[in-house]
Amino acid sequence: MAASLPHPKIVKKHTKKFKRHHSDRYHRVSENWRKQKGIDSVVRRRFRGNISEPTIGYGSNKKTKFMSPSGHKVVLVSNLKDLETLTMHTKSYAAEIAHNVSSKNRVTLLARAKALGVKVTNAKGRLALEA
């Protein structure tokens, strides 16, 4: 497997999920984030002691956005043709085998990935014991 290209340190500025205001108070209010639009809303007016809203400042560095912790960008792979598109980019991209690939085809994909030197993120997932 090829090591990733050098890159700036991956920083996640906010790992907690942004929850909707009053989702803890009322069961009918789901946790999915909704922007507060009321004229008197303390969350919208950013009063001290209230939940924080998602803002552009929480965004990731453009160079490290969508990177996995290994430093590769993950590409979903369903067949050998998809896998072979990554041969020239083994340092910057890693393959992730799709959920709907059978365990029989998964074994062939893993063997081909090893031959090409492509990193597979979910290599241990759903492998047949006999194969």
UniProtKB/Swiss-Prot annotation:
PROSITE patterns for this protein: RIBOSOMAL_L32E (PS00580)
Name of protein: Large ribosomal subunit protein eL32
Region forming the signal peptide: none
Protein's UniProt keywords contain Ribosomal protein: yes
GO molecular function: structural constituent of ribosome
Example GO biological process: translation
Name of the gene this protein is made from: RPL32
The organism of origin for this protein: Candida glabrata (strain ATCC 2001 / BCRC 20586 / JCM 3761 / NBRC 0622 / NRRL Y-65 / CBS 138)
Keywords: Ribonucleoprotein, Ribosomal protein
UniProt KW Ribosomal protein keyword: yes
Top-level taxon in the UniProt lineage: Eukaryota
Similarity annotation: Belongs to the eukaryotic ribosomal protein eL32 family.
Native organism taxonomy: Eukaryota, Fungi, Dikarya, Ascomycota, Saccharomycotina
A single cellular component GO annotation: cytosolic large ribosomal subunit
